[in-house]
Amino acid sequence: MTARDPTRVPATLEDLLAIPEEQRRHELIEGAIEEKGSATSEHGDAQHSLSAFTFAFKHEPGGRWPGGWWFGTEVEVHFDPANTFRPDVTGWRRDRVAERPRGTPVRIRPDWVCEILSTNRRNDLVRKKRVYHRFGVPHYWIIDPAEETLSVLRWSQDGYVEILAAERGETVRAEPFEAMPLQVGIFFGDDEKDEAPAQEG
């Protein structure tokens, strides 16, 4: 782990937003501006497939699909003066957030965040994870394209608890979206199969 320079002046949200929007693939993490890892085709495919899966949840509840959520992809979310992130996919429950979050950065704490690991995986697994926990994000998913795995984490007082670990080839029900079976392989290039049985996670 790289040592932090105690004399460094912390960056601010204003410093982050000063980067031109079309060039801003950056995050403010613990007072430092860091560029997100380069998006590989595997990362992009996983992100696209996750957005397709969550489509069933993005409407008002009570219709054909479960609904009940707002979602955003690469939305800037502000937590505190030292931390503004761009999670790969972010969700807010409609029963808590009446209107779709707008503007940038969004200042409403998410109910669910998913990060897809890339070259800066330490940020997702350690530093950003600590912030998500500190601000009470209830659900945290981690998709690892290299290992072809999905980790589903649930908030607890002492830290996130992994309640489900799944790999390519498995079909699971993963909270908070357990109303729909999830074929994990769709994140890693597999076509969705109608006949796949679901196992409880």
Per-region residue spans from a language model:
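Gly/Pro/Ser/Thr-rich low-complexity, intrinsically disordered segments predominantly at protein N-termini
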Residues: 1-201
